[in-house]
């Protein structure tokens, strides 16, 4: 557990290590250490707080892992919201590992199986008209987990054209997608606000 003398999370490398530590705590508390450890990345994800890859996209000589990305544009949300996003994505990993179909429409629509998995882990899940049971909010249980483990807010964020000036903006596993400037395109591109997977 982090002590009172923990350095502020204002450094990218320290933040990346910290997120791995938080995921380990979440895996232990909410998933009985059953989740395969993903490769955690921090990259901009337009319109989403995070995503998890359907396939194992990270490889070395012996191991392949899923990617769990947290959007760099929203890292400075309260820690209980970051934890809620990690639990949300952990539910997708759990579903993948246990052959539970928790989404439909090519991973875009979060169904009632996803809702049940997330609520079993103390999250508050509400329905989004387009994306299903995806709106994810922390509960008192989530906050208690953060307090008991002395988790602290992350104080670094990537400011892009998408994130500047959107204080209080909502996306992905937290609320409706953020409106973004659109580039002309002859095809339609859909992005899941929770897992960030895009489909054409």
Feature annotation, model-predicted:
Residues 1-5:
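Short, Lys/Arg-enriched N-terminal segments with co-localized hydrophobic residues
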Residues 7-76, 97-200:
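Metalloprotease/metallohydrolase-associated module, dominated by Zn2+-dependent proteases
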Residues 84-97:
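Active-site recognition of the HExxH zinc-binding catalytic motif
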Residues 53-55, 82-85:
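Surface-exposed beta-strand edges and their flanking turn/coil or helix-capping segments
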């Amino acid at each position: 557990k982090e002590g009172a003398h923990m350095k502020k999370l204002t450094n990218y490398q320290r933040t990346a290590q910290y997120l791995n530590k938080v995921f380990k705590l979440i895996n232990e508390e909410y998933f009985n250490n059953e989740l395969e450890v993903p490769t955690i990345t921090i990259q901009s994800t337009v319109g989403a707080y995070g995503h998890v890859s359907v396939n194992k996209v990270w490889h070395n000589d012996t191991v392949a892992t899923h990617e769990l990305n947290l959007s760099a544009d929203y890292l400075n949300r309260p820690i209980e919201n970051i934890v809620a996003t990690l639990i949300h994505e952990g539910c997708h990993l759990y579903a993948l590992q246990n052959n539970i179909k928790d989404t439909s429409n090519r991973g875009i629509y979060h169904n009632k199986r996803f809702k049940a998995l997330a609520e079993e882990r103390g999250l508050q899940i509400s329905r989004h008209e387009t994306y299903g049971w995806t709106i994810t909010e922390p509960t008192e249980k989530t906050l208690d987990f953060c307090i008991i483990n002395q988790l602290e807010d992350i104080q670094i964020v990537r400011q892009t054209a998408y994130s500047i000036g959107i204080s209080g903006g909502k996306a992905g596993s937290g609320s409706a997608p953020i409106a973004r400037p659109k580039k002309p395109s002859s095809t339609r591109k859909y992005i899941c606000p929770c897992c960030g997977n895009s489909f054409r």
